[in-house]
Swiss-Prot record:
Gene from which the chain derives: bpt
Lineage: Bacteria, Pseudomonadati, Pseudomonadota, Betaproteobacteria, Burkholderiales
GO biological process: ubiquitin-dependent protein catabolic process via the N-end rule pathway
Enzyme class, first EC level, given as a word: transferase
Catalytic activity, as annotated: N-terminal L-glutamyl-[protein] + L-leucyl-tRNA(Leu) = N-terminal L-leucyl-L-glutamyl-[protein] + tRNA(Leu) + H(+); N-terminal L-aspartyl-[protein] + L-leucyl-tRNA(Leu) = N-terminal L-leucyl-L-aspartyl-[protein] + tRNA(Leu) + H(+)
Source organism per UniProt: Burkholderia lata (strain ATCC 17760 / DSM 23089 / LMG 22485 / NCIMB 9086 / R18194 / 383)
Name of the protein this chain belongs to: Aspartate/glutamate leucyltransferase
Length: 276
């Protein structure tokens, strides 16, 4: 993604943008990254956040950012145009396999069972990355703080005999934007092998967007060099934000320069960047 020279005057004119100091990239080992941050957070409502997402921003709690790395365009914002989406045979099979899961949509809230699942997921999938040691406060700041129209979705098995709730399998946080749903974060039962819960969750979001009359599901960033991001390229068609324009993305032929570690470590220019 290229560095922006300007942002639309409205409705973003009240915001300020600044570049962070360099920090270790969380997606590509050995890389140095930085972000462009939108502030102040209390002015970022659902309408403004919709415009920011269209410009490649994401959020973590109330922290709204996009990649702003020197010499690197590895992070490509991607979205699925839901009316044109055509599931693959594997995706259709996955949808059928998990059709008995019961999805419950609610406002963001803390639940001890959710937090326990989150910790099991982090310990199994991201051990040693820091998030496997998240306290309850850190969990809440990361996933349960939002100033926009956000929802928590839990996926359970069918209720057990006697009315007991079915086993919790997955929890997903989503934002409802003016032009789509934005997938914030998903965690699931790590002991369930070969379930592709993450793929099922995106398929569910696509169906929800259709039912709400929303044209897109935003999937965050796709990174060609990151195996963890490979699944996003399996949704067709897929649009990517390239050089400031959303266009159909061909992951096999995308014209991006290779990630250059030397350039990624280049000295940062002084002062604010972007529009701030």
């Amino acid at each position: 993604m290229t560095h922006p020279t300007e942002l639309p005057l409205s409705p973003l004119s009240a915001l300020q943008f600044y570049a962070t100091a360099p920090y270790p990239c969380s997606y590509l080992d050995g890389r140095v990254a930085r972000s462009q941050v939108a502030t102040p957070s209390h002015l970022i409502n659902s309408d403004i956040y919709t415009e920011l997402v269209k410009a490649g921003f994401r959020r973590s709690g109330v922290f709204t950012y996009r990649p702003y790395c020197d010499g690197c365009r590895a992070c490509v914002p991607v979205r699925v145009p839901v009316d044109a989406f055509a599931p693959s045979r594997t995706q259709r099979r996955m949808w059928k396999r998990h059709r008995t899961l019961v999805a419950t949509v609610s406002p963001l809230h803390y639940d001890e069972e959710h937090y326990a699942l989150y910790m099991r997921y982090q310990s199994a999938r991201h051990a040693g990355g820091g998030m496997d040691r998240d306290s309850r406060d850190q969990y809440e700041q990361f996933l349960l703080q939002s100033r926009i129209n956000s929802r928590l979705v839990e996926f359970r098995d069918l209720d057990a005999p006697g009315g007991e709730p079915g086993k919790l399998r997955m929890v997903s946080m989503i934002d409802i934007l003016g032009d789509g749903l934005s997938s914030v974060y998903t965690f699931f039962e790590p002991d369930d092998q070969h379930t592709s819960y993450g793929t099922y969750n995106i398929l569910w979001q696509i169906e929800q967007a259709k039912s709400l009359g929303l044209p897109y599901v935003y999937l965050g960033y796709w990174i060609r060099e990151s195996p963890k991001m490979a699944y996003k390229a399996n949704f067709h068609p897929l649009e990517g934000l390239i050089d400031g324009r959303w266009k159909i993305l061909d992951p096999e032929r995308i014209d991006l320069p290779p990630v250059d570690a030397a350039l990624a470590r280049a000295p940062l220019p002084g002062g604010h960047s972007g529009s701030g």
